[in-house]
């Protein structure tokens, strides 16, 4: 712990954050001492949230009165995709006229296949509950890495505190649940692999498996590369290839269409250019150049793609900086947000990574004040129902106060993500080596122990 004089030298925001974190630490200590009971209670709370979502989305307000035209819209279409495959119908259409088409590799069909064995309500209830359990798994993995918690305490905190609060308060998580999205099923095992798996024979395998279901997680191989864990890189690529090959053997026609036509013909991106929902709601830097005052002209599109590549590179550089400071959770957040805003399509539910912020704040404290401020800005953007102010019909064309509100709502997630990435790149003051030698961080000690055990 730092002494009073050290705390007095800190900016007010940092002192307030430290005081809040200390109080939270005391509360979580009680949860850790009653881990089993808290885990059971937390699982029950998540079951109630899943039941509420299954019954009330979209007929009543879900998070700040954010109504949805159809509950679990994306999940309903994915289950229908599986039913089409079961009777030999088309999975990948040549003309992409709507957003509701299958965007994943054929291996992802297995994620949705069990939902065809039950009724719609049961499927939505089970899917939502499983999503919340995956959210708890993600949070528990981050807690173990950042706070050196034992698994019982990590799961207790995640089930009783982290996952319920995230679902009820954070907009990206709420949107994810209301649409029946798949992201948490992929993020949880990937985070566990990146932060907790230390056995060199297994490290990287789960990242590769998730990348076979959706190509996006392959970006996390950069995490292993930055740490020069080359065996983990090959494990990830090998497991991705193995799952893809298995899916190719089961779905040869669909696999050929996806990898040789859908990914190569450019239609996956071009069809968005005239889609009002994407233009108004995507938080990608590429999408910015299709909004007022831009028109999506060829030069503007080229600039957008360059900026997307720059955002991904910025995320990698920020992750490298934080890994050099031994802040693994912070580095993962940088990679995730860089890849998100650097993707040509970035929906609100892509920003579920906000659940990592508390652990970035406590990992190897103290965090530099400018980084703390950037993280709080990102959290603030994730608390506001931005989708309600984006003018999805694109009907407002005037340059007035309303335009500024719309502009802010459309770009808040991207801007605050970039602010964090820039803040993470700015070097922080090196810790006092004598202080570190006398009082080693618990997280560092646990990390060394875990590596030795692995």
Predicted regions span which residues?
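Membrane-embedded alpha-helical segments of multi-pass membrane proteins
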Residues: 129-134, 181-189, 210-216, 237, ...
């Amino acid at each position: 712990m730092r002494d009073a004089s050290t705390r007095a030298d800190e900016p007010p925001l940092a002192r307030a954050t430290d005081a809040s974190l200390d109080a939270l630490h005391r509360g979580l200590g009680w949860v850790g001492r009653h881990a089993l009971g808290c885990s059971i209670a937390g699982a029950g709370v998540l079951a109630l949230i899943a039941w509420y979502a299954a019954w009330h989305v979209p007929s009543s307000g879900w998070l700040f009165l954010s109504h949805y035209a159809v509950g679990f819209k994306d999940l309903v279409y994915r289950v229908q995709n599986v039913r089409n495959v079961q009777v030999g119908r088309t999975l990948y259409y040549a003309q992409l006229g709507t957003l509701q088409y299958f965007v994943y590799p054929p291996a992802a069909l297995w994620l949705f296949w069990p939902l065809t064995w039950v009724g719609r309500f049961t499927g939505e209830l089970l899917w939502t509950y499983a999503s919340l359990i995956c959210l708890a798994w993600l949070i528990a993995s981050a807690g173990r890495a950042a706070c050196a918690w034992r698994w019982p305490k990590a799961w207790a905190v995640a089930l009783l505190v982290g996952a319920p609060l995230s679902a009820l308060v954070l907009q990206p998580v709420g949107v994810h649940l209301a649409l029946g999205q798949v992201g948490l099923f992929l993020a949880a095992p990937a985070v566990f692999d990146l932060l907790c798996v230390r056995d060199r024979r297994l490290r990287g395998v789960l990242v590769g498996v998730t990348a076979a279901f959706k190509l996006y997680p392959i970006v996390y191989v950069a995490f292993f590369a930055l740490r020069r864990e080359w065996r983990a890189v090959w494990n990830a690529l090998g497991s991705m290839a193995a799952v893809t090959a298995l899916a190719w053997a089961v779905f040869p026609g669909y696999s050929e269409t996806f990898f040789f036509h859908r990914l190569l013909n450019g239609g996956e991106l071009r069809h968005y250019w005239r889609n009002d929902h994407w233009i108004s709601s995507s938080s990608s830097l590429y999408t910015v150049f299709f909004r007022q005052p831009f028109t999506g002209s060829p030069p503007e599109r080229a600039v957008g793609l360059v900026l997307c590549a720059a955002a991904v590179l910025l995320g990698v550089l920020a992750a490298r900086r934080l890994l050099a400071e031994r802040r693994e959770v912070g580095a993962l957040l940088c990679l995730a947000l860089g890849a998100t805003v650097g993707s040509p399509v970035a929906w609100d539910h892509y920003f579920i990574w906000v659940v990592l912020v508390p652990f970035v704040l406590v990992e190897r404290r103290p965090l530099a004040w400018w980084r703390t401020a950037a993280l709080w800005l990102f959290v603030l953007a994730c608390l506001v129902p931005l989708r309600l102010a984006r003018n999805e019909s694109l009907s407002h064309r005037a340059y007035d106060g309303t335009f500024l509100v719309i502009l802010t709502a459309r770009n808040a997630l991207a801007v605050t993500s970039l602010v964090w990435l820039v803040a993470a790149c700015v070097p922080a003051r090196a810790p006092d080596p004598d202080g570190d030698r006398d009082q080693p961080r618990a997280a560092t000690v646990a990390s060394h122990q875990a590596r030795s055990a692995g």
